[in-house]
Amino acid sequence: MKYCHHCASPLVQRVPEGDDKLRYCCDSCDTIFYQNPKNVVGTLPVQGDRVLLCKRAIQPRLGKWTLPAGFMENGESSLDGAIRETLEEAGALIKVQKDSLYTLFNLPAINQVYMFFRAEIINLDATPGFETEEIGLFAESEIPWDEIAFPVVRSTLEHYFQDLPRKRFPVRMFDVHHGEDRSITTHVISHSHHEY
C-alpha cells in the first residue's frame, strides 16, 4: 500500500499509539489500515451461571454490550486470538477446554467469519482495555437484551442459556444474511451433539 484510500496522501509504516504492530498509517487524515484476516474470534466467558459482557467504548455500537471479541492477528490461531481478545477487552484470564468452539457465523455480505468459544473465568482482577467502557457479569434475567451490540452475540447468548439447563453445548454454525432493510436472518447449517 502506498496511498490512503480516504484522502490519497502517501502512507507511512509505524506502530500507532496504543498498538504493538507495524501498520500503514495516513498522517494527513489519521486513518490506520489494519491488514488482518477477516476472522473475528471471541469467547463466551462464564463464572457460575453468569456471563461476562463488555460495554463498548469504541465504534461501531459505542455504549452497547458485547462478548469480548475482535479480529485475529496474523500468526495466531483462532483460539489464541479469542483468549487474547478476552484479556485485552475484559481483563479476564480464562480457561478453555479443547472442544470449546460454540458458535460460528459466516457473514458473506461483509466477508467475515465470527467464532465464539466457551470459556471459564479464572481471574477477573485485571483492568479492561481501552475498547471497553465497563464489564459486567450477568445472569440470563439481568442481561440488557435491548442493548446487545451485534446479532451474532445475541444469538450466541440465547443458545447458551437454552443449552445451560441440559449442560449440553453443541457447536452451531450459521449463515447470516443481510436484508435490503438492514435486517439480519440466520440459517443453521450445522449442529453437533456433544455433551460436556
Regions found by a protein language model. Name each.
Residues 13, 53, 99-103:
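A short linear hydrophobic-aromatic micro-motif
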Residues 21, 38-40, 46, 60-62, ...:
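Short connector loops at helix/strand junctions that flank enzyme active sites
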Residues 1-43:
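Acidic, metal-coordinating catalytic segment for phosphate/diphosphate chemistry
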Residues 3, 23, 44, 53, ...:
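Conserved hydrophobic/aromatic beta-strand scaffold that supports enzyme active sites
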Residues 72-159, 163, 167-168, 178, ...:
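Unchanged
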Residues 2-6, 92, 179:
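Small, basic N-terminal interaction modules of short regulatory proteins
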Residues 46-88:
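Conserved Nudix-box catalytic region and its N-terminal flanking loop in Nudix hydrolases
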Residues 173-180:
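Short, highly charged C-terminal tails/helix-capping segments
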